[in-house]
């Protein structure tokens, strides 16, 4: 069963646009939004397994230039 998570991302000053463009293209990213509030970008990420989801977040998302912090919220129920 696929797993999904919302990843809330804070970027460095003046890096939001570039980070957003890079993140939106990553495999597994289903939706990407720039937002107001304490975070700058929110992603919906899907993967086949929890392990694969972790790899996407740790290796790909956190590797994008300009990201200063992430918070991941794994979904437990979808309706």
Can you describe what each PLM-predicted range is?
Residues 1-79:
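A compositional/biophysical signature of low hydrophobicity enriched in polar/charged and small residues
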């Amino acid at each position: 069963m696929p797993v999904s998570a919302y990843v809330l991302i804070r970027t460095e000053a003046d890096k939001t646009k570039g980070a957003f463009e890079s993140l939106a293209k990553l495999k597994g990213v289903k939706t990407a939004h720039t937002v107001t509030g304490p975070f700058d970008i929110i992603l919906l990420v899907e993967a086949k397994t929890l392990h694969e989801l972790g790899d996407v977040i740790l290796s790909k998302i956190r590797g994008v230039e300009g990201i200063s912090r992430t918070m991941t919220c794994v979904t437990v129920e979808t309706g």
